[in-house]
């Protein structure tokens, strides 16, 4: 661990322990323990838990005896138990020790999540390898990646330069909020390799409730790899602070986020055969295409979503929630997000030599064809900001879980600012492009019965920038129960008509310049999934039709495809369990009608085989196994450092290589630990040494990785 990392570690640890100390004191004041030897106190506590999960406290007199209700008026101090009154959460959620959710920035809803305390996928330390069949990547932690599953690839149109870092970043749309009956802290650290080439990740999260309905959380994550190849280093750091109140009538979710990216760009190996030939004895000696290119990006944002409810049926003191009452809500959402980026290099640092297998130089080339501004060096900067205001109304006819649960309607105003240097700015001065967009949207959702629920959303841009853009999304679930075990059939339909990204239309830098006038692109999505949790079965069919699709072609610049492109996918997840033996399979089949526009592997798979057992029952759980990823050969997307964008290269195919990790994971009470031999397959397959996930970017070499996660909830 470097001195800088240690310094950050010490400061973060000090803050966390200080918060834990304060939280422990606050918890002691709010949640006194019940004497388990007193049956009267136990009975009262159990009854109060039935009525309200947060009611469990019995007032005691000076002798330690419980004060009954009739005597409380004479007590010197009376503690009023405040319940969790929110209409967002039902009784089953309220009774959880910890639960987590994400606030919807369009409507008065939240989306529930899972608290990470289990062994499941704990050893998968690369964030981009967790979902289904994983991502194609540049081989290091803190580097860019793009999903092999086309239907998960980022498809936004705001600051697309950082799409390759989607799995790391905290945004207002995915910032998490926690409710905890006790203060909750997670501290996790992982490392691998020699200090010179080490990979490290550090995660610290603290969440605490001030009252049962009010809480805050702090999150800090950093992912860092020094790399084993020349000029290979990546680092992503993110921070978020959130606060919420989910009261009986008023709710608010607010927070700030910050993300920073620093990436040394080496452009990949000069020649793929360098990886397997004996000409170079070590990875550090292999020539790379660039030796001084650097990308840096920084993001700062804040958000606040609030709503006030007006019940149309009188509420009583015994009613904890408005969820089952006729009511309407008036709400407001505001967010601000700014990204800034800088790319730098030199002509000398981007020039490389081509050699034969004896080491003789046969050619000299530069990574870039064009040097528009300066023939010797690049220093490209640009920025984008978005200020969003939304005002919405939500109608709740009679019950949030009813046939017509809620109907939302709102209007929004987005203010965009784009900043980049152009040659004409030498004459006119630095200029900022500003756009305003005005739109309306609606949302409806309900639950016909325990067998059927549905949801629909529509947004239409009325005027200004991106006028005429349409976004429609509808989904539903059907439930069938066999011996109380659910079988879930889900469907989703989506349609989008949208203006291409500002940066696909206008871009100026030392290496790339374009001004386009692309038409609106359209996308139609259809998904059908069948899930049988008791059998470990998940089957999904996906179909996407792309019209006027904007993509980055073989020359790494944006183009628009006039014809319709279709992408079809079939996903299967089947988990088998035989006692402690688990055999988990994830397989994805995909087909694109035009591989030069949308390139996907025909088959991609992730297999996880492990044995799980408890050496000490209910105290120590151990998991030993292997994870493997594989995909068939295809023309994987290339990565362009100057634009931070993926493009459809047609030079080299990658794939047909099994990437395998072997690991041991254990959970002892509140601590999880793991030891992993990463890329264990490096020397197992003599014919598969050309191990690439992206063209010219080899996987990291085999190394031993270890780490731990410790959570505190007291």
Enumerate the predicted regions with their spans.
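Terminal non-domain segments
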Residues: 5, 11-12, 285-287, 351, ...
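Exposed, low-structure sequence patches enriched in small/polar residues
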Residues: 180-182, 292-349, 355-714
């Amino acid at each position: 661990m470097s001195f800088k990392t240690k310094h950050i570690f010490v400061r973060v640890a000090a803050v966390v322990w200080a918060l834990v100390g304060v939280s422990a004191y606050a918890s002691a004041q709010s949640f006194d323990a019940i004497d388990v030897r007193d049956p009267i106190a136990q009975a009262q506590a159990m009854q109060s838990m039935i009525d309200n999960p947060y009611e469990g406290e019995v007032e005691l007199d000076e002798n330690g005896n419980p004060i009954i209700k009739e005597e409380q008026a004479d007590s010197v101090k009376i503690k009023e138990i405040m319940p969790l009154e929110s209409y967002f959460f039902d009784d089953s959620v309220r009774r959880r020790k910890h639960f987590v959710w994400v606030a919807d920035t369009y409507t008065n809803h939240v989306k529930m999540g899972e608290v990470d305390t289990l062994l499941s996928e704990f050893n998968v330390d690369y964030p981009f390898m967790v979902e289904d069949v994983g991502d194609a990547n540049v081989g290091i932690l803190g580097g860019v990646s793009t999903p092999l599953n086309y239907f998960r690839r980022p498809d936004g149109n705001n600051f697309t330069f950082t799409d390759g870092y989607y799995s790391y970043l905290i945004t207002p749309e995915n910032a998490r909020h926690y409710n905890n009956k006790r203060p909750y802290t997670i501290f996790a650290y992982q490392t691998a390799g020699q200090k010179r080439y080490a990979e490290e990740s550090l995660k610290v999260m603290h969440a605490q409730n001030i009252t049962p309905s009010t809480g805050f959380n702090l999150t800090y994550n950093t992912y860092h790899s020094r790399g084993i190849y020349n000029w290979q280093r990546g680092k992503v750091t993110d921070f978020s602070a959130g606060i919420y109140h989910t009261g009986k009538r008023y709710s608010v979710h607010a927070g700030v986020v910050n993300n920073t990216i620093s990436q040394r760009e080496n452009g990949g190996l000069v020649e793929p055969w360098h990886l397997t030939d004996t000409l170079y004895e070590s990875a550090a000696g292999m020539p790379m295409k660039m030796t001084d290119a650097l990308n840096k990006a920084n993001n700062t944002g804040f958000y606040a979503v609030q709503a006030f409810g007006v019940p149309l049926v009188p509420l009583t003191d015994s009613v904890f929630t408005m969820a089952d009452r006729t009511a309407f809500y008036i709400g407001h959402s505001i967010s601000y997000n700014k990204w800034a980026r800088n790319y730098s290099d030199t002509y000398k640092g981007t020039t490389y030599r081509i050699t034969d297998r004896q080491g003789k130089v046969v050619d000299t080339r530069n990574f870039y064809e064009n040097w528009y501004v300066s023939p010797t060096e690049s220093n490209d900067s640009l920025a984008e900001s978005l200020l969003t205001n939304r005002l919405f109304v939500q109608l709740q006819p009679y019950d949030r879980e009813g046939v017509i649960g809620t109907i939302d309607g709102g209007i929004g105003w987005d203010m965009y600012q784009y900043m980049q240097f152009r040659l004409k700015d030498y004459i006119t001065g630095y200029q900022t492009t500003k756009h305003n967009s005005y739109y309306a949207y609606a949302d409806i959702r309900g639950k016909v019965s325990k067998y059927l629920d549905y949801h629909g959303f529509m947004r239409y841009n009325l005027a200004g920038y991106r006028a005429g853009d349409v976004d429609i999304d509808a989904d539903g679930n059907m439930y069938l129960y066999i011996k109380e075990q659910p079988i879930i059939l889900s469907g989703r339909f989506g349609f989008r008509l949208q203006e291409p990204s500002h940066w696909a239309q206008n871009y100026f830098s030392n290496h790339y310049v374009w001004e386009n006038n692309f038409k609106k692109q359209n996308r139609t999505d259809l998904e059908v999934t069948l899930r049988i949790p008791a059998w470990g079965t998940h089957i999904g069919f996906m179909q996407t039709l792309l019209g006027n699709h904007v993509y980055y072609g073989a020359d790494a610049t944006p183009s628009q495809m006039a014809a319709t492109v279709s992408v079809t996918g079939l996903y299967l997840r089947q988990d088998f369990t035989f006692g402690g033996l688990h055999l988990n399979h994830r397989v994805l089949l995909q087909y694109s009608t035009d591989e030069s526009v949308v390139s996907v592997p025909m088959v991609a798979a992730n297999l996880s085989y492990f044995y799980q057992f408890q050496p000490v029952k209910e105290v120590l759980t151990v998991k030993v196994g292997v994870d493997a990823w594989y995909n068939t050969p295809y023309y994987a997307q290339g990565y362009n450092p100057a634009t931070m964008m993926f493009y459809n290269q047609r030079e080299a195919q990658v794939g047909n290589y099994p990437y395998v990790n072997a690991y041991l994971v254990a959970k002892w009470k509140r601590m999880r630990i793991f030891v992993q031999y990463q890329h264990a397959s490096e020397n197992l397959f003599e014919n598969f040494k050309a191990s690439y996930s992206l063209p010219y970017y080899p996987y990291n070499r085999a190394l031993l990785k270890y780490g731990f996660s410790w959570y505190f909830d007291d």
